[in-house]
Amino acid sequence: MSIKAEEISALIKQQLEKYDDKLNVNEVGTVTYVGDGIARAHGLNNVLSSELLQFSNGSYGIAQNLEANDVGIIILGRFDDIREGDQVKRTGRIMEVPVGDQLIGRVVNPLGQPVDGLGEIKTDKTRPIESKAPGVMDRQSVNQPLQTGIKAIDALVPIGRGQRELIIGDRKTGKTALALDTIINQKGQDVICIYVAIGQKESTVKNSVETLKRFGAMDYTIVVEAGPSEPAPMLYIAPYAGTAMGEEFMYNGKDVLIVFDDLSKQAVAYREISLLLRRPPGREAYPGDVFYLHSRLLERSAKLNKKLGGGSMTALPFIQTQAGDISAYIPTNVISITDGQIFLEADLFFAGTRPAINAGESVSRVGGSAQIKAMKKVAGTLRVDLASYRELESFAQFGSDLDQATQAKLNRGRRTVEVLKQPLHKPLPVEDEVLILYALTHGFLDAIPVPDIQRYELELYDYFASNYNDLLDVIRTTGDLPEEDKLNEALKNFNEGFSISKK
C-alpha cells in the first residue's frame, strides 16, 4: 500500500490548523510562613492589592500586604493544612460572593456558603465584596421613612430609607433586640433585611434566627454569620460580604435594611490581622487605616437616584462601648461616618426603661424628612419636653416646693417616659404609634395614673381597632392626621369608659 505525498501534506496542514499556541500562564509563588490565619508568600511579583489567591490545597486568601520581597495574605477559612513550601497562585480577580433571591431565608457564612443545613444555594450570580460607593450625583436625599415599630425611635430619632444610623451602647443594653424588632416590623413593607452577626456566640445567633422564624421574618431576611471560633479574616470580610448581597437588591430598585452586629468585633479582628502582618500600630494598637475600614463599608449604603432605579440600603451598624464611653477611638470614628446615633444607656436599661434610649445623646441627622406628616405633628416637641423633664427631675428630688407649671411638666414627663417604654418583640404599626403619642401630647393621659399607662395603651389600640378603624385608616393611607375634632371626640369617649385601677 503506497502512501501519497498529497495525503501526508493534507494531514500535516490539518494538524497545523488545529495547533493552538496559546499558553495558560499562572503566576505562582511559594508560601514562606503560615499561622494565625495569615500567610506570607514569595514570588508573586505582579499581584494586586486585595486580589484573590488560591493555595495548592484549594483554600483561598486575599493579598493584603504588598512588600518588596513577599506578599502578606489573609487566609479565608481553615489554614491548618497549609504548609511552608506550598504553592499559591494568582486568580486575577477579587473575592466575590453569591447574591440573589436564592439567599433569602438562609443562614450563610461570609463566603456565601450555607451553614443552616438546608442544602446548597443554587445561584449563578456573584458580586465582588469590595465595590465603589455611589457618588454624590448617584444619590438622592433621604425622604422615605423606615418604620422600626419602636415608638422612641420613630418619634425621637427617625430613620429614613438609605440612612446610616449607629446603635451604640454597652453590652447587654438591648442592641440586638432593637435590630430584631426593626426586622420583624418590615413584614409586608417590601424591604429585604440582612443581619450580619460578627463574632456573636453560636447560641445567640441561633436564638436570633429562631426569633425571626417565629415572627415569619426569615421570609425576607438573609443572615450572614461569622462566629467567634472563625479565623479573624472571616470576621473582617463578613460586613463587606453582607453589603455585596444587599447591593444586588439595591441596584435592582429594592429597599434593603442591613444590620452589622457589631463593628467593634470587626475592628478587633482587623487589628489582629494588621498586627500579625507587622503593620505599624496607632492609637489603641489599631492600624492607621481603621477609619477607612468602616467608612468604605458604610458609604455603600445610600438612597439611589431615579436613574439608577431609586433603590436604597439602610445601615444599622452597632458599636459596643466600655462603661458608656462614647469618646473612645472606634465609637468616635463611626459616629463621624454615620447620619446619627441611638445611644442605649445601661443605667436606663437597669432602671426598667426599655428600650433604654438616651434621648439627649441620640440624634438623627435626617430628622423630620424621614417621618410621615402625622408623626411630625405629634412628636415635634417630644424631645424638648423629655429633655426639660430630665432637668427638672434632678431638682425635684431635693423635695423643694414646686409651682403648678413645673409640677405639670413633671407629670407629663413621667407619662412620656412610660409611653415610650415598649415590650420585647412587640413593634407597633405607625398608626398606633401616632395615636398614643397624640393622646400623650394633647393631655389625654394627664389624669391617668402612671402605673395604668401601659394598660391604657393596649386598651386604646383595641378600642380604636373596633370602633374607629376609619380614623386609623386615614393615618395608614395618607400619612396625615384625621380631623382633630373626630380624633379628640374618640379619645374623650375612650377616656370616659376607661377604669382607673384602685390603689
From Swiss-Prot:
It catalyses: ATP + H2O + 4 H(+)(in) = ADP + phosphate + 5 H(+)(out). ATP binds at G169, D170, R171, K172, T173, G174, K175, T176. It comes from the Bacteria. The keyword Ribosomal protein does not apply. GO terms for molecular function: ADP binding; ATP binding; proton-transporting ATP synthase activity, rotational mechanism. PANTHER family: ATP SYNTHASE SUBUNIT ALPHA, MITOCHONDRIAL. This is ATP synthase subunit alpha.
